[in-house]
Amino acid sequence: NAYACSPGMGSEPGMAWNWVSNLAKFCELYIITEGEFRDRIEEVVPTLEQGKNMHFYYNPVSEEIRKMCWNQGDWRFYKYYKEWQWKTYLLAKDICKVEKMDVLHQLNMIGFREPGYLWKLSQENGVPFVWGPVDAKDKFPVAYLDGAGLKTKLFMRLKNFLTGIQLRCSGRVRKAAHQASVIFSASSNSQRSFKKYMGIDSPLLNETGCYVQEHPIMDKSGKDTFDVLWVGKMDFRKQLGLALKSVAKSGNDKLRLHIVGGGDAEFYQSLAESYGIADK
């Protein structure tokens, strides 16, 4: 079960694609995904040696729901996402009647709030259920709210409050967690959450990986600058502002910060100017 899955992308779609395209080198996969990236998937799969092991099933949603998904913070999406997960469960049930499965894997989205229903299918047919990697941090660090606007402070504190309630009280989350043969935690914070709220030990496995590459070590001792690369979405949660503030406070004229990502670039450009580091 991989709601967002696409080659050539980052974030959730790229994460899921890298999981399934690499698992397919060792396993035959039956992958249920949303239909937004169907064209990309069907263009690339035939070019892969392991493509013969990748069988995609599509459960598409409307363009309006897709916009809600991409607009992170639009909580209306969870209603439709839950409905999508139920339809996916029914589709998976039909697939299991035809194909023999060894594992049911709930891959993404990685947030714990919506665990899908493959755990229920596991209860019904006895096929082992695996969940994760899962992001189950119990709170956004409130120290990061320093300098944030009132709206952001209220939103993040409300989110922290609701997250705590869901970790303690969500029946479906707890059922999924206890049905799982294994849960992979995407972070040490998530590990602590599963242990604290559900008494479950979960191995640590970050959702993103990398391809091991060998490059010659370059001697950079003669460089005039110290270059730092920051990659991410330019929004409050990723704390680019903290990186800019750190550069400003360092007072190091040789420090250069290279920023790659999408989002509110104008805001962070003006913030850099206000710190007097726009040329860095």
Task: State each model region's role.
Residues 268-280:
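Nucleotide-activated donor-binding/catalytic signature segment of Leloir-type glycosyltransferases, i.e.
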Residues 1-52, 123-127, 182:
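N-terminal subdomain of nucleotide-sugar transferases
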Residues 80-89, 103-147:
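An aromatic- and histidine-rich active-site surface loop
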Residues 30-87, 92:
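A conserved catalytic-core segment of Leloir-type glycosyltransferases
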